[in-house]
Amino acid sequence: MSKRILYIEDNPENRLLMRRVLMAEGYTVEEASDGNSGLRKASESPPDLILMDINLPEIDGYEVTARLKQLPNMAGVPIIAVTANVMKGDREKTLAAGCDGYIQKPIDIDLLPSQIESFLKKE
């Protein structure tokens, strides 16, 4: 059975690209376009991994992460920030907020599958 990944991203082009890459690698992909819908989808049916933009409408990725980490059914589900926030200290802030990993935009499509696999192996 393929691993299920939830991708929370407000940009439709980014969602399309990520979906294509992940599906080509054999993953089942679910999507959410904002923080609230991502929170709802993840809490109703926890995925194997969450990839999430930080700058989301409604509630940002930091808040989504904090709320998900409080849910018992989300224990062990890696939350990976996929973000263009690349200023000094952004990576540390993201990890301190509870994200389990950090992938910088623009995404390196060739490197992405091995990054995802490494996060899935940690669970």
Language-model features and meaning:
Residues 53, 83:
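Active-site residues of response regulator receiver
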Residues 9:
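Conserved acidic carboxylate
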Residues 16, 107-116:
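C-terminal output helix
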Residues 31-49:
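Acidic, metal-coordinating helix/loop segments flanking the phosphotransfer/catalytic sites
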Residues 12-30:
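Two-component/phosphorelay signaling modules centered on CheY-like receiver
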Residues 57, 75, 87, 106:
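The feature encodes the CheY-like receiver
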